């Protein structure tokens, strides 16, 4: 609501450039939020009201304007919509554009590959992958060519940074666990890789083909939980996926409560750099980080149960279809690794 005032001012007052910039940025970000909400409504099939989870989540008010993360959020939501409409090329292009803003939309390709293996339908996945690579290269190549040092900065930082604020690793250090003996990049890659292998195994051996957003949500939770850093706005990444994968208000509110608690804790902890007497100590901060991690794992645990016991899945109640399944919804006999075959 402050954005229009920040742009045009009141009573002829001169508005500082920083406030004007914030106002314009906020309007653009909330336009992207509306786009993400529309895409979620369109992707939700017979449950369009599930998009209210995205529209009304406390995280939108708390961290919606903290960074430009609503851009990849909107692009990933559009990519899922494109896949649900059986437009793999468009899905891939949107994934590539999203990955140019934040790398995490690329994780959707892992989920698509898993379902391609399970259904033995690789055509759509191949087109989506090519579209993603092409779009990412088209956006990044000019900057990598003209400004190579600036372009590499993000990737160098991601490679070289240690365990940073909000991460499980930093909280373990504050609690006395000797994580400093680990190489940060190797530790993160190793643990994330193990979790992804587990998610793939779950998806391939589940009694019914998992839904696309269920697999994507599990992979993304594994990514943010094991990452070197956890910024408060990362909760935005999960919102459309939670709305589509686990649309139960009780569970969403439990998860959002954990995120809100962490939001308060991280600013209190960071306050030690300006006012140490009014800040949160390291050990207390670590406890709040673990609460945030537990809220993510709570959602992940419910989704795992929904995959292994589909009767608990609120979206699949009375049906086997996946609203976002796209070409994977084409019925065919699936050769299962279980003793008895099932129909995807």
Task: Give the label of every model feature segment.
Residues 143-172, 279:
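Extracytoplasmic catalytic-loop and juxtamembrane helix elements of membrane-embedded
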């Amino acid at each position: 609501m402050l954005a229009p005032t920040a742009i045009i001012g009141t009573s002829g007052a001169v508005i500082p450039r920083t406030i004007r910039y914030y106002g314009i940025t906020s309007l653009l970000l909330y336009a992207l939020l509306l786009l993400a909400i529309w895409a979620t409504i369109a992707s939700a099939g017979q449950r369009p009201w599930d998009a209210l989870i995205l529209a009304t989540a406390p995280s939108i008010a708390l961290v919606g304007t903290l960074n430009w993360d609503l851009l990849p959020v909107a692009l990933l939501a559009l990519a899922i919509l494109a896949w649900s409409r059986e437009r793999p090329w468009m899905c891939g292009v949107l994934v590539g554009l999203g990955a140019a803003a934040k790398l995490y939309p690329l994780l959707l390709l892992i989920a698509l590959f898993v379902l391609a293996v399970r259904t033995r339908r690789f055509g759509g996945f191949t087109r989506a992958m090519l579209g993603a690579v092409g779009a990412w290269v088209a956006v990044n190549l000019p900057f990598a060519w003209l400004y190579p040092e600036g372009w590499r900065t993000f990737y160098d930082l991601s490679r070289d940074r240690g365990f940073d604020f909000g991460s499980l690793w930093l909280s373990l250090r504050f609690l006395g666990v000797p994580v400093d003996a680990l190489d940060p990049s190797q530790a993160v890659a190793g643990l994330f890789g193990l979790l992804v292998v587990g998610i793939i195994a779950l998806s391939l051996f589940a009694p019914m083909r998992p839904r696309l957003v269920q697999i994507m949500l599990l992979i993304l939770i594994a990514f943010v939980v094991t990452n070197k850093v956890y910024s408060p706005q990362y909760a935005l990444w999960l919102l459309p996926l939670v709305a589509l994968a686990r649309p139960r208000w009780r569970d969403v509110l439990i998860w959002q409560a954990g995120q809100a608690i962490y939001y308060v804790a991280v600013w209190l902890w960071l306050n030690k750099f300006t006012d140490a007497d009014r800040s949160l100590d390291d050990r207390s901060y670590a406890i709040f980080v673990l609460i945030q991690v537990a809220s993510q794992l709570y959602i992940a645990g419910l989704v795992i149960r929904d995959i292994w016991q589909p009767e608990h899945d609120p979206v699949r109640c009375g049906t086997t279809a996946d609203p976002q399944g796209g070409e994977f919804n084409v019925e065919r006999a699936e050769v299962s690794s279980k003793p008895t075959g099932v129909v995807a």
